[in-house]
């Protein structure tokens, strides 16, 4: 999904950085950015030049960018970083707003894209349409691309991607991306109906309220086994 966005330095292919414990799907491209070895191994070889950095580790991310260079041991440039604001596969672990801001800064400095996967967190689940709209999760960062699926059509197969800005949108020229079942009438109708119900019944705000109620209720039990409630 990044045609034309993968430059090279000295003939070295560009890289995409993904997070340890990240999960992005089971189709070939998404699986290539998914960390869990047990899921990946049966499908090797996967898409090359995707590297994993320790989630939440600023030093590791900085070092991954710093490996770009023209020298013998230098690597190609980083074209994009893909991450989830809350890692479900890691046990519902937020990356942290401060870390996400750091990722955005490094992407801007190095002319790399920031892709946020909102398949699990989008469509109102965190009390906002998208988790990146919550400053306590994203630090106010706006990604270059957002992916979404699942909740957008109420369980019917449907997914999509939002690209922000004319430069990024220009990468997708007619015929550069397609799918046999993309934009099918039944899926589109299911998506429109689902979004209509979410808006009409104010379900995004309700998710925020119910989340706070659940969090407060769990901690109010005083059970020593409960030390925190993660997620939103």
Please identify what each model-predicted range represents:
Residues 1-232:
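Conserved N-terminal phosphate-binding loop of PLP-dependent enzymes in the Aspartate aminotransferase
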């Amino acid at each position: 999904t990044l045609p034309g966005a993968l430059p090279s330095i000295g003939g070295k292919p560009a890289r995409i950085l993904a997070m340890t414990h990240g999960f992005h799907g089971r189709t070939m491209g998404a699986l290539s950015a998914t960390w869990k070895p047990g899921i990946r191994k049966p499908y090797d070889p996967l898409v090359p030049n995707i590297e994993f950095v320790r989630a939440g580790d600023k030093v590791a991310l900085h070092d991954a960018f710093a490996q770009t260079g023209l020298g013998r041991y230098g690597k190609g440039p980083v074209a994009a970083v893909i991450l989830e604001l809350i890692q479900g596969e890691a046990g519902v672990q937020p990356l942290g707003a401060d870390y996400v801001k750091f990722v955005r800064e490094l992407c801007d400095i190095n002319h790399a894209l920031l892709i946020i996967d909102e398949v699990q967190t989008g469509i109102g689940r965190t009390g906002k349409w998208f988790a990146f709209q919550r400053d306590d999760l994203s630090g106010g960062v706006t990604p270059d691309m957002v992916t979404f699926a699942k909740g957008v059509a109420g369980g019917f197969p449907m997914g999509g991607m939002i690209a922000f800005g004319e430069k990024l949108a220009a990468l997708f020229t007619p015929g550069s991306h397609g799918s046999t079942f993309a934009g099918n009438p039944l899926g589109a109708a299911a998506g429109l109906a689902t979004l209509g119900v979410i808006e009409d019944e104010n379900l995004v705000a309700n998710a925020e309220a119910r989340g706070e109620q659940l969090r407060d209720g769990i901690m109010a039990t005083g059970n020593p086994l409960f030390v925190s409630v993660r997620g939103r």
